[in-house]
């Protein structure tokens, strides 16, 4: 896969944003990068195939510094700095740029974060595989959003069934485990807050949330937006929880964004995925 630095013919990039989740920040990155004083020709903008700007980089003190425009609009000051430096523009397909951004930040997680201890057994994986095949079928195609993906059990199975997973979780140690085990890929998964997933994720054909919870009365305000976000951006959605009460909460929250999920009991797993919401 082509890295962002290679796309703009630059050396290693130092991003203003410390992590992928910060790419939606409309304030500080734009201010900080404009403190640079690039020489003529030492500025780059990366456009997608439709001419949308996605990345801005400048060279200062011998190093390339970058900020992402994947989820925000360039500021007037940034564009002025580019023009002053008489910078160059490059162009790549948007999907390739998105993958490269995910790789940029998730690759650092894989390299620098110690993975959590293995949390899956072959028996558990097979139970989830059987459930997903029952609900979705086989020979699938399209994108599958894997919400609160953990170490990637859902992504690995949906990839086997033909989907292209896009996964997220807010636990970088679990993500690191997923990367080291091969269940997750660094260009397919990111560390973000699932309560604002639609700020980063596209609409998708499929959505899964394996073992959501545990949900309690005092954590419902956390889980409700997570469910609403996943249900709101996916056409077919499957969420598993441990208790029937949690399943009814999930059904209610999905209905709030116009989605009808039906509840069923999953006898394969007496603990983690006992109740299924699907629709």
Where is each model-derived feature located?
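A short SAM/SAH-binding and catalytic strip from SAM-dependent methyltransferases
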Residues: 204-220
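Conserved SAM-binding strand-loop segment of SAM-dependent methyltransferases
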Residues: 184-196
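Conserved alpha-helix/loop element of class I SAM-dependent methyltransferases that forms part
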Residues: 119-141
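Conserved SAM-binding motif I beta-strand of class I
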Residues: 164-169
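Conserved SAM-binding loop of SAM-dependent methyltransferases across substrates and taxa
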Residues: 151-163
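Conserved class I S-adenosyl-L-methionine
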Residues: 139-150
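Conserved beta-strand signature within the Rossmann-like core of class I S-adenosyl-L-methionine
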Residues: 234-243
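N-terminal accessory interaction module
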Residues: 2-100
């Amino acid at each position: 896969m082509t890295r962002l630095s290679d796309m703009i013919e630059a050396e290693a990039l130092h991003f203003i944003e410390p992590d992928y989740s910060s790419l939606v920040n409309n304030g500080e990155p734009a201010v900080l990068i404009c403190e640079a004083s690039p020489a003529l020709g030492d500025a780059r903008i990366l456009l997608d195939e439709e001419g949308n700007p996605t990345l801005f980089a400048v060279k200062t003190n011998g190093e390339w510094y970058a900020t992402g425009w994947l989820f925000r609009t360039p500021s007037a000051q940034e564009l002025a700095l580019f023009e002053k430096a008489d910078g160059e523009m490059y162009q790549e397909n948007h999907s390739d740029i998105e993958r490269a951004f995910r790789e940029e930040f998730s690759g650092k997680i894989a390299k620098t974060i110690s993975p959590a201890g293995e949390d899956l057994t072959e028996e558990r994986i097979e139970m989830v595989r059987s459930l997903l095949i029952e609900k979705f079928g086989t020979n699938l195609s399209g994108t599958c959003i894997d919400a609160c993906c953990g170490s990637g059990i859902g992504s690995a199975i949906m990839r086997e069934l033909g989907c292209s997973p896009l996964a997220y979780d807010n636990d970088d140690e679990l993500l690191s485990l997923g990367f080291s085990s091969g269940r997750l890929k660094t260009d397919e998964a990111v560390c973000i807050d699932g309560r604002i997933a639609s700020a980063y994720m596209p609409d998708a054909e499929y959505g899964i949330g394996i073992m959501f919870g545990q949900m309690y009365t005092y954590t419902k305000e956390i889980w409700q937006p997570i469910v609403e976000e996943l249900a709101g951006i996916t056409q077919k959605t499957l969420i598993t929880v441990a208790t029937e009460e949690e399943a009814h909460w999930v059904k209610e929250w999905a209905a709030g964004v116009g989605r009808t999920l039906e509840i069923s009991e999953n006898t394969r797993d007496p603990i983690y995925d006992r109740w299924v919401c699907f629709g």
